[in-house]
Amino acid sequence: MIKEVIVVEGRDDITAVKRAVDAEMIAVGGFGINSKVIKKIREAQKRQGVIVLTDPDYAGEKIRKYICNRVKGVKHAYISQEEGTKEDDIGVENAAPEAIIRALNLAKCEVKQERKEFDMNDMIFFKLTANEESKERREKLGMALGIGYCNTNQFIKRLNNFGITKEEFIKAIKDLDKGNE
């Protein structure tokens, strides 16, 4: 049983997560999220902690940000777009139990103090921007670090806000490069 309450978008997501783990869950109802649901999430966060696991698309990211702006200290779990896509449908409900377990094991909590550990120079040096393969490298690295896929500026923010260390980052880069050999 997972200690934290897992927050997902809908009932189909709950079904998929239940196939992977035993946990208490809250479905926000997509963009229908309201103050009652936010109150439930706040109470769960105080009581046992919360992990947000939304779809790997624009709408999922908007819902994640909405929750994060209203409930402090939640952890974030991410599945890749590849893991969440079945035919032309994208969502947590399409992810295999193994992908959901991996995402939950890598769940990260945002740190309070602002860090400047990573910047654009790191992105350029490690070919995470301004390179033909940068999008794919960011996606693979984001999954390995448990911070999900996003554009370069958001990637820098997540590296800093989720407390990723240079050591973790370098190890993940080396593993990524070994896998590409």
UniProtKB/Swiss-Prot annotation:
It is an enzyme of class 3 (hydrolase). It holds the Pfam family DUF4093. One of its GO terms (cellular component) is cytoplasm. It comes from the Bacteria. Binds two Mg(2+) per subunit. Mg(2+) 1 binds at E9, D55. This is Ribonuclease M5. It comes from Clostridium botulinum (strain Hall / ATCC 3502 / NCTC 13319 / Type A). The gene is rnmV.
